[in-house]
Amino acid sequence: MGNLVIGSRGSELALWQANHIKERLKKECLIESEIQIVKTKGDKILDTPLNKIGGKGLFTKELEELLLKGEIDLAVHSLKDVPVVFEKGLDLACITKRADVRDTFLSVKFPDLMSLPKGAKVGTTSLRRSMQIKLKRQDLDTESLRGNVQTRLKKLECGEFDAIILAEAGLCRLEIQGAKYRKAFSVKEMIPSMGQGALGVEMLKNHKHFITLQKLNDEKSAFCCRLEREFIKGLNGGCQIPIGVHASLMGDRVKIQAVLGLPNGKEVIAKEKQGDKTKAFDLVQELLEEFLQSGAKEILEKAQLF
């Protein structure tokens, strides 16, 4: 029998993630595999902000097409990039243990967000981050920052930006210090994207190794990530819209924090729910209802114009 084929994007971070799964497959499932690099739409279009490209699955669609054709056996994604509704026949075989979920401030000159001068330019790919930055500092200029982690850091070092915001998990995985000043926001200060810090392994549901891959699943991380994805699904959202949501477990209790608003930091809704773990999905529905009653759908429609 031939090796399983892992589909992955070609960035250093994506390949770290694919190799991580490759090593775990060998060690924990006794399965040999090889990696096939796939360029996605989001990788090909680098001169346009992600929200302007349009469509869902900017970093997953091409991988999903290869899964459906049987040309690859599994696709390794950053879970935050995975649409909440799957193509027919596909699903997540596992969600890995979460790394650090936080967003991180990086700058050559300034120690933190509040020390930036008025009009400072902050680079980010994310409308969610832009919204939460503007909520704190309306006087800052948030601009689109595309490219892989190293490209973004070079733009910071060359002075194109006064600061940039990256995911802490990616910096840790690549063992990158990043810049002279590096400070992670607490989850309370900046609510992460759904699934941030976790990897999702996508496969055909009828693949003979679909069940086998569940050995790589982390139950606690998967539970929290599925709550977050349920919240996004209820708002018909994707990864390119200004929504942050984070679920965390504290013993038998769960806390779900969420925020959405316009990318300019206006018309922001922020709420949280806490309760018994056994009622977690009911809590998500209650939180959704509160957001919808507060005008969430209307705000997200306005956000499409940015």
Swiss-Prot record:
<dbReference type="InterPro" id="IPR036803">
    <property type="entry name" value="Porphobilinogen_deaminase_C_sf"/>
</dbReference>
<dbReference type="GO" id="GO:0005737">
    <property type="term" value="C:cytoplasm"/>
</dbReference>
<dbReference type="GO" id="GO:0004418">
    <property type="term" value="F:hydroxymethylbilane synthase activity"/>
</dbReference>
<dbReference type="GO" id="GO:0006782">
    <property type="term" value="P:protoporphyrinogen IX biosynthetic process"/>
</dbReference>
<dbReference type="InterPro" id="IPR000860">
    <property type="entry name" value="HemC"/>
</dbReference>
<keyword id="KW-0808">Transferase</keyword>
<comment type="pathway">
    <text>Porphyrin-containing compound metabolism; protoporphyrin-IX biosynthesis; coproporphyrinogen-III from 5-aminolevulinate: step 2/4.</text>
</comment>
<comment type="similarity">
    <text>Belongs to the HMBS family.</text>
</comment>
<feature type="modified residue" description="S-(dipyrrolylmethanemethyl)cysteine">
    <location>
        <position position="239"/>
    </location>
</feature>
<dbReference type="InterPro" id="IPR022418">
    <property type="entry name" value="Porphobilinogen_deaminase_C"/>
</dbReference>
<comment type="subunit">
    <text>Monomer.</text>
</comment>
<comment type="function">
    <text>Tetrapolymerization of the monopyrrole PBG into the hydroxymethylbilane pre-uroporphyrinogen in several discrete steps.</text>
</comment>
<protein>
    <recommendedName>
        <fullName>Porphobilinogen deaminase</fullName>
        <ecNumber>2.5.1.61</ecNumber>
    </recommendedName>
</protein>
<dbReference type="InterPro" id="IPR022417">
    <property type="entry name" value="Porphobilin_deaminase_N"/>
</dbReference>
<dbReference type="Pfam" id="PF03900">
    <property type="entry name" value="Porphobil_deamC"/>
</dbReference>
<dbReference type="InterPro" id="IPR022419">
    <property type="entry name" value="Porphobilin_deaminase_cofac_BS"/>
</dbReference>
<dbReference type="Pfam" id="PF01379">
    <property type="entry name" value="Porphobil_deam"/>
</dbReference>
<keyword id="KW-0627">Porphyrin biosynthesis</keyword>
